[in-house]
Amino acid sequence: VRAPKETSHIQASTLPMNSLTARLSLDLLGLNKDQVLAVTGGPGAYGGFVIQLAKADGLTVIADSNESDRDLLESLGVDIIIPRGEGFAERVREEFPNGVDGIADGALLNESAIEAVKDGGSFTSVRGFKGESQRDIDFTATWVTAYDCKKAILETLCQQAEEGVLTLRVADSVTMQNAAEAHTKLEAGGTRGRMVIEF
């Protein structure tokens, strides 16, 4: 698959893994236009793509955020922003008393986010759900390898990047000799976009 037009190699390298993971999450959730999706970890690379793809799919999106990330989430298209911190599920229920139709759990909140989902809703996590199944919620794990060799999906994502539906966010790039610096930054948390190692 060719890189999106008018992008650098560094920018283009941020597309495949996280956008495919985000697309898979939404496909696993199986939500329909006008349904409501909650996203945890929205400011991150995965969460940002989930938000933008969900909006392109016609979903209403609610996400939690620190005040410092509020402008970013607004630029990604989030409809409702709630404060990050304890009580995620309760804050979601304040906005949607019956619960949301699905959650893409990029921040790995696991059981602390379940109460935000309505009975019979959907929950997917990037590392697999840790907790007890309940209330007929459909729990899935988003493993990007499920979309290995799915050329048509990646081509669509490329086109969406070209059209501005998806934003290719580079947090920073480092040379191969400074790869440890990238790992140090990732371990510190708070990365917005992808760290890229240049070869």
Residue ranges of model-derived segments:
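Terminal helix/beta-alpha structural elements that buttress the NAD(P)+-binding lobe
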Residues: V1-F199
